[in-house]
Amino acid sequence: MNHIVLDAQAKTTIDALRKDLETELDDDMESIVTDGRYTYIQKIISTTVEKPKEKLTISDKIDKIVTNRFLGIPIFLLIMYIVYYISVTTVGTFVTDWTNDVFVVAIQDAVSGFLSSVGASGLLSAVIVDGIIGGVGAVIGFAPQMAILFLFLSILEDCGYMVRIAFVMDRVFRYFGLSGKSFIPLLIGSGCGIPAIMASKTIEQDNDRRLTIMTATFIPCGAKLPVIALLGGVMAGKVAGWQAAGFIAPAMYFVGIVAVLVAAIMLKKTKPFSGKPAPFVMELPEYHIPSAKTVLLHVWERLKGFLIKAGTILVVACIVIWFLSTFGFEGRSFGMVEDTANSLIAAIGDFIAPIFAPLGFGNWQSVASSLTGFSAKEAIVSTMGVLANVAGDPEDAVNVAAGEAKWFPTGMAALSFLIFNLLDSPCLAAISTMASELNDRKWFWFAIVFQNVYAYCISLMVYQIGSLVLYGTFGFWTVVAFIVLAFMLFMLFRPDPYKDQKVYSTRSVEA
């Protein structure tokens, strides 16, 4: 077979025509060629094959609205807002409040009474009641909110809507250098980051796959929901009003999506991540009424993983947290301390706190809570619950919320804390999965460093610039925040020097 040989001028002309065609049709060349083939086939069939005129199905009529290029994304954002609003406020908050204020307290009282009746020591009673039950109970209390969230997400997945969102978002993601294939792991990530990272195997191009692995955990997973609910549903709800609580939860989901897009734009303009996104072709299934059995099974599978982690990793974490917050040095002796400011966890937090001071939460309590989040994100809530219960009445949610609110001088500080723990490195299990999927020590450590530096920079800008706008606060770190903002804007809007670079996969896709 003879090959066509083109000179440099012909190649330049063809390349220019290709770019003009992609701009005019608002699509990539592979998709344009594929669409042209199907259009031509349809044209031939229409003149040679006779068949009754097909009527639009109900699915087709719905798709004309929910996959519309103008209405598709606003409808998706509205649906996700309603899902998170209902899950974290309204019904979710009512059940969670009952769990925290009645169920967990009743268990603490019953266990405490039983231990007293059998003559258990005060130390053992404190470990079990305050450390384990108090810490794990602080997380278990948010299980109803998680169950409601998983219920809504499972219904949307089973009815066929979620798969269409990947199709709708393909146009948006392609503009930012990714394809709709990268959005599928993000959808999965709303349940758990581990399967989201593993879902990146379906992405053929290595650079897009690495980028998706690095950013998939930016989407709030089920483990992060208690953290969002704590700061939004408890602190904002008890202290600042339920209006703020209802806004924070869905806002964090949108923050995660925006964080993914911003990171994608910046990284795609660097050589290691450059190249065009792979074409995204998928078959949309018919809409159908969700199966109650399937939906409930999905909810249970997601919730079971959370409960198992609460009964294993969190129990150990709560014991360690209780020990570190109960023991320390007072005077020259080591032992149980009455003031947690003299505890071991306070010493560790105080040592690291200056690093986080520019973010607005430079106190040992919030820093210690963030550090425990690297073992499991739910441990943040456990730590905050244990530390808040020491200073206040653990049976009074208002006192606990007020105690935690004192750790954050302003609302911007609490928001900064929330965003940092949303975007920083995930839990140890997800980190282990990242290492396995990247299969390269260099890329693994780059991913870890990028996630934490990125989270730090975003939180720094949120707190410093937000404080300047709302409170008129200005200082050295405000200047640093504007420098970081200027650098990110430069990376976002500079021309892409590697836009037309072709990238080939060097790794086969595993089933």
Language model features by range: what are they?
Residues 30, 46-59, 114-125, 282-297, ...:
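Short, membrane-interfacial amphipathic segments enriched in basic
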Residues 75-86, 149-154, 232-235, 252-268, ...:
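Hydrophobic core segments of alpha-helical transmembrane domains in multi-pass membrane transport
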Residues 65-167:
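Core alpha-helical transmembrane segments of integral membrane proteins
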Residues 269-270, 490-506:
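Membrane-interface capping segments at transmembrane-helix boundaries
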Residues 1-52:
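Alpha-helical transmembrane helix bundles of large polytopic membrane transport and channel proteins
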Residues 222-249, 432-438, 457-475:
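Transmembrane helix-loop junctions at the membrane interface of multipass transporters and ion channels
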Residues 32, 90-132, 176, 197-212, ...:
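Extended, low-charge hydrophobic alpha-helical regions
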Residues 101-106, 163-194, 273-298, 345-347, ...:
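Juxtamembrane inter-helical linkers in multi-pass membrane proteins
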